[in-house]
């Protein structure tokens, strides 16, 4: 670690226990044990001039005027590492803009679930594969203490969705599912608008006792995303002791304690929910313990930060695989079609507003 002097970390770094702040917070603490670390807002207009022993690592942004994207074009970096969520779904909307900067990066530390890594070779991003390092998310169990001692009786199990209503969360399907099963309690934390068939609980601070007390009343966390990299709420639910129920398109598959639900057919989804209503308490407790073991052994910040440190110190910098004309055209179209496209008036307005706020703060 003597070859690197300073790490420029482009990531939100705050005191919140939710992502993205908690990612930046834990990374900063880990990196400062070995390097001088400077942090930046990932959506700010800024160009970093690299020192001869400096590393640029962090969150790229759809807008080309942002700090990571503009700084990555500068010569002289010891290493350039993208570190951001990755969802290689067929639409390509989440990450298509990365085509403009991936070649400048030595590696892409892709925060995503194993299900998406399994689909990468069939996606529009297949030529990125040599540069990608799979980086599973993490939670601190002290921030999300175990609270689910007992489950509701068979037939009275309750389902909780935690999240927003953006396109990738597929909440319209969740509404259909809840309406098809009016006898089952489906609730939502994360907003104040109404979702058909779900009880709206508003927004809550999960560090507060009243939020934990409310969550304790539920048995399953449900998320039916259609293009969701790997929602942190799944790991948070595991820590609390709830059993996650998620679509494969939410990033996780092959974990016995994370129950998958199909989203291609509503009847199959209804069948899955009805089956979960009759699972024994003993089986739920078994899944609960398997999930806690997963958190202790893998989905933790020591493992996460160790992977990042390894890539900072590595000299491996593979080229992209050969891309087809279909790949090129697909990603070009996806960037323009994406709801996150930087040139959309609403997105550009938010970008300017945010940077005016940063400019004002810097003058104080």
Predicted regions and their residues:
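N-terminal pre-catalytic "stem/leader" segment of glycosyltransferase-like enzymes
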Residues: 1-62
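A short, active-site helix/loop in glycosyltransferases that binds the activated sugar's phosphate group
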Residues: 92-96, 103-130
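Acidic anion/phosphate-binding donor-loop and adjacent secondary structure
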Residues: 92-93, 133-156
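Conserved catalytic-core segment of nucleotide-activated headgroup transferases in glycan assembly
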Residues: 141, 152-200, 205-206
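Aromatic "clamp/platform" in nucleotide-sugar-dependent glycosyltransferases that forms part
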Residues: 226
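Short hydrophobic beta-strand element within catalytic cores of glycosyltransferases
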Residues: 242-246
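Conserved acidic donor-binding segment of nucleotide-sugar-dependent glycosyltransferases
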Residues: 258-267, 275-281
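A charged, aromatic-enriched C-terminal amphipathic alpha-helix characteristic of glycosyltransferases
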Residues: 281-343
């Amino acid at each position: 670690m003597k070859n690197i002097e300073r790490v420029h970390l482009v990531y939100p770094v705050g005191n919140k226990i939710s992502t993205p702040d908690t990612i930046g917070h834990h990374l900063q603490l880990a990196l400062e044990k070995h390097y001088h670390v400077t942090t930046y807002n990932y959506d700010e207009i800024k160009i970093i001039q690299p020192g001869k022993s400096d590393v640029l690592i962090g969150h790229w942004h759809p807008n080309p005027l942002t700090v990571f994207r503009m700084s990555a074009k500068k010569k002289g970096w010891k290493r350039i590492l993208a570190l951001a969520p990755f969802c290689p779904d067929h639409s390509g909307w989440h990450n298509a803009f990365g085509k403009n900067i991936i070649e400048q990066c030595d590696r892409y530390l892709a925060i995503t679930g194993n299900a998406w890594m399994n689909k990468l070779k069939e996606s529009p991003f297949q030529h990125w594969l040599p540069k990608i390092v799979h980086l599973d998310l993490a939670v601190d169990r002290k921030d999300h203490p175990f609270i689910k001692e007992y489950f509701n009786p068979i037939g009275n199990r309750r389902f909780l969705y935690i999240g927003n209503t953006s396109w990738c969360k597929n909440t319209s399907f969740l509404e259909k599912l809840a309406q098809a099963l009016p006898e089952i309690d489906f609730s939502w934390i994360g907003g104040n608008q109404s979702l058909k068939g779900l009880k709206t609980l508003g927004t809550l601070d999960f560090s507060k006792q009243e939020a934990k007390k409310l969550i304790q009343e539920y048995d399953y966390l449900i998320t039916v995303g259609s293009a969701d990299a790997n929602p942190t709420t799944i790991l948070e639910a595991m820590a609390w002791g709830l059993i996650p129920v998620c679509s494969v398109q939410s990033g996780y598959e092959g974990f016995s304690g994370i129950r998958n639900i199909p989203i291609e057919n509503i009847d199959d989804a209804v069948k899955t929910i009805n089956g979960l209503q009759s699972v024994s308490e003993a089986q739920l407790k078994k899944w609960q313990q398997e999930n806690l073991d997963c958190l202790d052994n893998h989905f933790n910040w020591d493992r996460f930060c160790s992977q990042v440190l390894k890539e900072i110190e590595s000299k491996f910098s593979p080229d992209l695989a050969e891309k087809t004309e279909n790949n090129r055209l697909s990603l070009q179209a996806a960037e323009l079609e994406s709801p996150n496209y930087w040139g959309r008036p609403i997105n550009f307005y938010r970008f300017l507003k945010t940077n005016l706020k940063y400019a004002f703060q810097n003058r104080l």
